[in-house]
Curated annotation (Swiss-Prot):
It is found in: Secreted. Signal peptide: none annotated. The keyword Transcription regulation does not apply. Its main location: secreted. It comes from the Bacteria. This is Carboxylesterase.
């Protein structure tokens, strides 16, 4: 059954699927091609007639994941240039005032799309939510800092998508005044950034941070260095005008080289002392440009930004195992390597013993995975919560602790494992969660997200600095836990991240 809805740019034709109206590939901006590859997003040109919106649009240009991780996180690749589009699932386009949830995908700001199978919005629509997902520019195209182009183009795309939601979602049954924006990993970092920037103020009422916070931002001088190296390797000037003519495949090749070098052991002769010293973890990420961002998002939120936004935040128990276990690196990590990493991170060598004492690792590889889980994910998220103690809006915390049996159980409750539970798409994620994951847990997690989007209350007490209580999601029992892993949490007090 076909359904036609009039948007601000023209009519779109969706389809009825199991009682839910679904619209795919609706443009929220013009395709970023040719001279417009690096410009700010431009409103879509109005069209005559009815535009077909029954199939997903192209996905943003991106490289494949490394093989070991790509076997677990299945991506959908759809070729084409018209990828600044969004998708809508609605229970009833004729309804009035339904809650809206807008999903921002993760992928280190270099991978992912709004059309991945695990992000199907049908379960949210079945539960009375108008669900929206979208694509945004990634990698060099979205985040390389160039003097003749706006910075943070990927973020500008996200804001444009939210503005489309504000202007159009009522036509799909949604309430533009009750929007929850949520994301995972780089998507959660994006949400935190949107909370921090005045440009996005008023576009959403609630936010969910899944495994990402506000500490990932690239300093302007580092962004300039990265752009210069990219251009040098491509044999062009470090400008948008020059890079606009470079074939996408070449951009992606250099993008992968740059990411591997910066995340490995960057040569100071190439990258300078700052980047060689670890100033950049994600080379393609929000840039502190003095316009969209004047400081790191975490600092802006500590100063009061986003304090009127209800917040649900959390992490998985074993985040970083996704990046160490599938590659086979865990058994080869030595105690000396852990000690060196602790020293670089500002912690004493004895910190490793605290991780073992709290049951977070016996072998060096397991200890390192827990340390980096805290360093990159858990502690930054807790610092966001701590900075909102006096906020008028409420803050709620969770920990996702269910351990996947995949790879003989060595992944644990790794990064991204909660996604098919949130979306109730367990059948789309067997590579990550196995063939018999607990559907009851998916129902519990998903329903909490729906409750939060509907009312601002996920169903458990708000986070506070006295008890630090969070909901620990696991099977067969999900329960409130007071101050998880307090000793290793305290190790990071006062340590810059």
């Amino acid at each position: 059954m076909e359904i036609v809805i009039r948007t601000g740019s023209g009519d779109v034709r969706g389809s009825k699927e199991n009682g839910i109206a679904v619209f795919r590939g609706i443009p929220y901006a013009e395709p970023p091609v040719g001279a417009h590859r690096f410009t700010a997003p431009r409103p879509p040109r109005p069209w005559d007639g009815v535009r077909d919106a029954t199939e997903f649009s192209a996905t943003a240009p991106r490289p494949p994941y490394p093989e070991a991780i790509g076997a677990l996180l299945i991506e959908r690749f759809i070729p084409g240039d018209d990828y600044l589009t969004l998708n809508v699932w609605t229970p009833d386009p004729n309804a009035v005032g339904l809650p809206v949830m807008v999903w921002i995908h993760g992928g280190a700001f270099t991978n992912g799309s709004g059309s991945e199978p695990v992000y199907d919005g049908a379960a949210f629509a079945r539960d009375g939510v108008v669900f929206v997902s979208f694509n945004y520019r990634l990698g060099i195209i979205g985040f390389a800092d160039l003097p003749d182009a706006p910075s943070n183009r990927g973020l500008l795309d996200q804001i444009a998508a939210l503005e489309w939601v504000r202007d159009n979602i009522a036509r799909f049954g949604g309430d533009p005044g009750n929007v929850t924006v949520f994301g995972e990993s780089a998507g959660a970092m994006s949400v935190c950034t949107l909370m921090a920037t005045p440009r996005a103020r008023g576009l959403f009422r609630r936010a969910i941070l899944q495994s990402g916070a506000g500490n990932m931002a690239v300093a302007a001088e580092d962004a300039t260095t990265i752009a210069a190296v990219i251009a040098h390797r491509l044999g062009v000037e470090p400008t948008a005008a020059a890079l606009a003519h470079v074939p996408v495949a070449q951009l992606l090749d250099v993008q992968q080289q740059v990411a591997q070098e910066i995340q490995g052991a960057p040569d100071p002769a190439v990258w300078g002392e700052r980047i060689a010293g670890g100033s950049v973890l994600l080379p393609f990420a929000p840039v502190i440009d003095g316009e969209l961002l004047s400081q790191r998002p975490a600092e802006a939120i500590a100063g009061g930004a986003g304090h009127d936004v209800d917040l649900l935040f959390g992490t998985t128990t074993d985040e970083y195992r996704l990046f160490l276990a599938p590659t086979g690196l865990l058994p080869f990590i030595t105690g000396d390597y852990v000690t060196t990493h602790l020293a670089k991170s500002g912690l004493d060598a004895d910190a490793a013993k605290a991780y073992t004492a709290e049951g977070r690792g016996e072998e060096p590889g397991d200890i390192l995975a827990s340390i980096i889980t805290d360093q990159v994910f858990r502690i930054p998220a807790l610092r966001i919560a701590e900075s909102r103690v006096d906020a008028p809006a409420r803050t709620f915390g969770y920990e996702f602790a269910w351990r996947t049996p995949q790879l003989d159980g060595i992944l644990g409750a790794c990064h991204a494992v909660e996604l098919p539970f949130v979306f109730r798409t367990l059948d789309r994620a067997a590579s990550l969660v196995g063939t018999n994951p607990p559907e009851e847990l998916a129902e519990t997690v998903h329903n909490a997200w729906v409750r939060f989007a509907t009312s601002g209350d996920p169903g458990w007490p708000a986070w506070n600095p006295e008890t630090r209580s969070v909901m620990r999601f696991d099977h067969p029992v999900s329960e409130m836990v007071t101050d998880p892993y307090p000793a290793t949490r305290a190790l990071w007090d006062g340590v810059p991240l």
